[in-house]
Amino acid sequence: KTLAVSVRAKEFVSYHCSCCGHCCRHIENCVMVESLDAYRMAKHLRNQHCGISSTDDVLLRYCEPMPLTDEGYPIYVLKTVGADATCIFLRENQCSIYAARPRTCRLYPFSVGPGERGRDFEYCLCFDDNQQHHFNSGKVLVKDWLYHNFPKEDKEFLKQQYLVIPEIGRLMHRMPEEMRQAAVFKILFYHYYHFELDQPFLPQYDQNNRSLLNELRKLAPSE
């Protein structure tokens, strides 16, 4: 179980990474792989000559699909291996894709959510079963951690995501149940598969969202 406590950017928190790999274990269905994550992972692994040439390859080899909502909104999570549900990318207690690790991993032990009262984002410190390993020494200034691990591209991606996800949810809720499987396939296509690795991510994501909403509106009856 994870306890999330709201923090401000100017706060100091006790945290120290000892490179023990504990936060990479017991993570089954825990680490979401978002569109931007899959794109970065694919580019990184392609450059490492790992037999990866597209986001499709990454998602098939390293991720599992799962529904996030009752309507079946699809997401991907990292695959795990072994009895202790270890991240598929953990090698000798080190992340083998560290430079392209998912945002969830880069921000740990913090998380980001939609902001309130005029703020773009809210930040939380996440306490979990690894508390004994990470939260007993060291000091981290929240804004410094975010500066290094939450770049502008991530912020712009999340702003777009926060705008489009509620609309997708409303459209899926209005759809006849027999249309939802078709909607799931369209979401997977436009949010995960329809990307060129040699083109910038954000313009593609923006266009994909426009195309996706147009397709979903055809499946949902007018109000």
Predicted feature locations:
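Short loop/turn segments that flank or connect secondary-structure elements
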Residues: 1-223
